């Protein structure tokens, strides 16, 4: 399966899915997160995140990925990659980050995203 990595304003990208770095609470962060929440529709995306968290399980773990609809974005889904907080690189951040993005790609494949 072929994927495209974009280093630009992903809130304007046309895609089946956009991968968004997320925290374990699926709450809006800063930077990229704020831009996507703004363009997608903050209220709808916040509600979808709460519902996804309940639907999948109560506790989300770093390294996992959870999908929601993308609402007003030019994409079908947002895949929320649960990423670690950077603590200097000595707390397995590289491995956990790699796991989060691997989980995202695996999920995109399962969802038939192109």
Task: Give the positions of each predicted feature.
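Macrodomain-like recognition of ADP-ribose-binding/processing modules
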Residues: 1-114
